[in-house]
Curated annotation (Swiss-Prot):
This is Chaperone protein SycT. It holds the Pfam family CesT. The gene is sycT. The keyword Ribonucleoprotein does not apply. It comes from the Bacteria. The lineage of its organism: Bacteria, Pseudomonadati, Pseudomonadota, Gammaproteobacteria, Enterobacterales.
Amino acid sequence: MQTTFTELMQQLFLKLGLNHQVNENDVYTFEVDGHIQVLIACYHQQWVQLFSELGADLPTNDNLFGEHWPAHVQGRLDGKSILWSQQSLVGLDIDEMQAWLERFIDDIEQRKEPQNTKFQPNSTSPILFI
């Protein structure tokens, strides 16, 4: 028997030890450390969708078919950068859902990391000047 979206979300939040928060449109809210918010919804009871607002100052990215599957797509909505992803509800189990959500959150954290802090040489790092 196929798991419904509501059952999948209840299992996910139970497994993570969290109270599930859902609004009237069946959109679940998942918060990480108070600085990342992921919205989880299901489109036409067929496509599970993850969505997060990245902020206004992030450069666009072309990761349409990047390193993740399902793909994490960065775009713009109402003047803000967003990240979204979707995959079929059919065959999606609790472990796959959790792994997908974790990869999505990791991707958000990497994209929100300031560009100037990605590489900071220390005193032992060899630096080549030409």
